[in-house]
Structure formats: C-alpha cells, structure tokens
C-alpha cells in the first residue's frame, strides 16, 4: 500500500504516472478511508501505512485559495470559458448559459461547423466581435466579445489552433489567449500536449502586458508539465475551491482540466464553475481586475 502511494507521489513525470496522478485527490481520499477502516479493525500496521500514504499524497496537492480582496482601483473584465463537447446538440441551452453570464469575453472550445453556425446566430447579436476556427476533430475554437478587438490572430500549436486577441480595457491593452491542448489519451498525445505547452511559452512571454489565458489545457495543477509551463511563461494559476471541471457530474466534477491563468499583475476577484448543458466539462466564469498601474 505504501509503495502505491510512493509511486503516485514520486514516480517520474512520464505518461502512466501522469494518468494515475491526475486523480490524486481521489487517491488521497481512498487512502484516508482505508486508514479509517484499518483503525476500526485495529490493524495498526496497515492503518499506519495508509495514513502515511495519505500524507504523502496530500502534500502533492495545491491548496485552493479564495481570491484575496483587492482594494486597488482598476478596470474589471468578466471572462467566460466553456468546452461545449463537440457531439453535444444542446446548442440553445448551452448558449443561453453563456448569455446569462453577461461576460465581456467568451471562450468556447470543441467548435465544429454546427456549433459555429449556432454560436454566430445566437451569440452574434450581443457579441458582435468574433473569431471562429471550426474543426471536426474536437479542437475547433471560438472567441466572442462585446469589446472590439484591437487585433486578433489565430496561431497553431502542433497543428491545433489557438486564438490570441487584444482589447482596450479602461485605456490599456489587455490580451486574452484561448487554447485547447491535446488530450493525453495515448503516449503520443501526451507528448503532443507537452509540446503544445512548450510552444505556448514564447507566445505568452512575447509581451509584458496583462494576459489572461483560458482553456482546456488537459492537465492538472499538480502535473509537472503544468508547473513548468507556468514557471517558464510567467503565468500564475488561479485555482480556487470548486474549480474542478471534468468529468461533469451534475453539480460536481473530479479534476481541474480547465484553467484561467494570469500575468501582468492582473488578478482574479472571483472564479466560479457552472454547468454547461450537454457537455462533459463544467465551465468557468472569472472576474478579472486589471490594476491601474499594471505594466
């Protein structure tokens, strides 16, 4: 039992350990339950092993924190992100969820031509500025905005599109990047996802203006690839309690695959998850403060 915990906590950052560690919170809960069961039956050695395993796993998990109150003045930007799940045909109810958020910018992922048509028709009147890159392979992407783009472009990471948009918010430029990294469902896809995260680094680091990166990165905050990406790009994670997004199980989800990452002294005053009708992901809604004297 202790050897399993050591494997989960200290195994090299490779494909199979990465898959197992994705559910580290659930593994920790299982070890804790086992320790209670062993204590109940007075199996002291097994209980000690399970408790030690619980501790080894628990210290690997970043503790979600509530955003700190920020008394500084500055502009606010409300950003919504949702992975709609390409086969999902609940177009109207999913789009209504986005509209009801009153977000300034909406990032949508897994957009095919059917979703592109529905999004343009239903979101277009309220969000007239849009960039849509539909795909049939679950990696189509779209960005809708109430605010006009200063400029917007599509870039590619190992063949997968991302959208980079610049806005003027309160008299300063702000950048929003929407990206959907490859799901590591195989050994090759695992390496492709890591190459994409590596390729994101120079894009993010190319400017010092406040940047908001949103998307399904198909990695968890305690994954080595995620930590390296944040460290090298200068982005800061904004994990908070209740930010787990996949798989969507009604009001719950198991692991945080979708992220809101910030740089340039931008800060999140709140991040909440919400149900996306028909999708296997929960969405994220972030309130972002842009300090007056941010670079």
Name every feature range the model reports, one short phrase each.
Residues 75, 79, 85-100, 108-295:
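Soluble catalytic domains of enzymes that build or remodel membrane lipids, polysaccharides, and related
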């Amino acid at each position: 039992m202790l050897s399993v915990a050591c494997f989960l906590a200290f195994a090299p950052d490779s494909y199979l350990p990465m898959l197992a560690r994705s559910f580290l919170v659930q593994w920790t809960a299982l070890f804790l339950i086992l320790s209670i069961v062993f204590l109940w039956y007075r199996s002291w050695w097994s209980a000690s092993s399970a408790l030690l395993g619980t501790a080894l796993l628990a210290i690997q998990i970043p503790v979600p924190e509530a955003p700190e109150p920020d008394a500084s003045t500055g502009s606010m930007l409300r950003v919504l992100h949702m992975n709609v799940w390409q086969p999902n045909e609940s177009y109207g109810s999913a789009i209504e969820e986005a509209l009801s958020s009153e977000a300034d910018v909406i990032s949508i992922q897994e957009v095919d031509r059917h979703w592109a048509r529905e999004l343009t028709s239903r979101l277009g009147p309220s969000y007239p500025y849009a960039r849509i890159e539909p795909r049939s392979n679950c990696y189509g992407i779209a960005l809708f905005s109430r605010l006009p783009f200063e400029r917007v472009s599509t870039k590619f990471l190992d063949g997968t599109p991302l959208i980079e948009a610049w806005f003027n918010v309160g008299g300063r430029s702000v950048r929003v990047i929407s990206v959907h990294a490859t799901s590591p469902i195989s050994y090759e896809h695992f390496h492709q996802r890591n190459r994409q995260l590596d390729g994101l680094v120079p894009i993010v680091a190319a400017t010092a203006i406040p940047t908001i990166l949103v998307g399904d990165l198909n990695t968890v905050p305690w994954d080595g690839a995620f930590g390296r990406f944040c460290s090298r790009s200068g982005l800061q994670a904004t994990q908070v309690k209740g930010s787990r997004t996949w798989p969507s199980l009604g009001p719950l989800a198991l692991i945080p695959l979708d992220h809101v990452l910030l740089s340039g002294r931008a800060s999140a005053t709140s991040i909440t998850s919400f149900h996306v009708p028909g999708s296997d992901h929960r969405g994220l809604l972030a309130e972002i403060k842009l300090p007056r004297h941010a670079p």
